[in-house]
Amino acid sequence: LDFAKHVIGIASKL
């Protein structure tokens, strides 16, 4: 899901 991808993107920023 796109939502999961968004969460992964945020986690990558951290």
Swiss-Prot record:
Modified residue annotations for Leucine amide: L14
Keyword tags: Amidation, Amphibian defense peptide, Secreted
A cellular component term, taken from the record's GO annotations: extracellular region
Location in the cell: Secreted
Tissue expression notes: Expressed by the skin glands.
Source species: Litoria fallax (Eastern dwarf tree frog)
GO BP terms: defense response
Secreted listed as a keyword: yes
Protein task: Lacks antibacterial activity against Gram-positive or Gram-negative bacteria.
Family to which the UniProt record says this protein belongs: Belongs to the frog skin active peptide (FSAP) family. Brevinin subfamily.
Protein name (database record): Fallaxidin-3.2.1
UniProt KW Oxidoreductase keyword: no
